[in-house]
Regions:
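Active-site metal-binding loops of divalent metal-dependent hydrolases
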Residues: 4, 35, 61
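Catalytic cores of alpha/beta
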Residues: 41-47
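His/Asp/Glu-enriched, well-ordered alpha-helical/loop segment
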Residues: 17-32, 48-151, 155-158
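Histidine/acidic-residue-rich, glycine-tolerant segments that coordinate divalent metal ions
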Residues: 2-18, 64-67
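Short, Lys/Arg- and Gly-enriched loop/turn segments at beta-strand edges
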Residues: 162-168
């Protein structure tokens, strides 16, 4: 379910819509933009409660990601970023995000109180499984999503106090 809760009708007892269907179907991966703007924190927590091991963090990040507030383009569309929130100049609609995946994990652990295991799984193994990349495949070669024998050795090491990335490893080599 791409960008769960974003631009979807809310839950209603007579017209439940796609949200309960997605949560109840074990084949569906629930994608969330965990920036506190696209999806509010109680809904993120609810997704982990109702769809554990099927909730994946996504960013929907645009070119303004990790850049200062200001005017940007999203394709041919004019976008204004204020406080890290991207909106179309024409009508004020949300226009993608400026979220970094590491921030989604940090928010999950430090602000929502999710377990580090669940938060990291939502950024790694769950999306890898959704695309079949947790097994050898023609796209990534070695499987991804876990730190285990036979898997690609791509990972970040974070400070356990504040979850800021301290080291970046790719193919088993330290980059940062």
């Amino acid at each position: 379910m791409p960008a769960m809760f974003t631009a979807l009708n809310g839950l209603h007892h007579r017209e439940p819509g796609p949200i309960p269907a997605a949560v109840e179907d074990p084949r569906v991966t629930i994608e969330l933009i965990n920036d506190g703007f696209h999806v509010q924190d109680p809904m993120v927590s609810l997704s982990f409660r109702f769809a554990p091991h099927r909730t994946a963090f996504v960013t929907d990040a645009m070119a303004a990601t990790d850049c200062p507030d200001g005017a940007y383009k999203l394709g041919a569309l004019d976008v204004n970023v204020v406080g890290g929130h991207a909106r179309l100049v024409s009508n004020g609609a949300i226009a993608g995000s400026t979220l970094l995946l590491e921030v989604a994990v940090r928010r999950a652990v430090c602000e929502l109180g999710l377990s580090p295991v669940d938060a990291v799984e939502a950024a790694t193994l769950t999306p890898a499984k959704a695309f079949g990349f947790d097994k050898p495949n023609p796209v990534t070669g070695a499987p991804i999503g876990l730190i285990a024998p036979g898997f690609a050795a791509d990972f970040n090491l974070a400070d356990p106090a504040d979850w800021t990335v301290e080291q970046v490893w790719c193919a088993g080599r330290k980059l940062k």
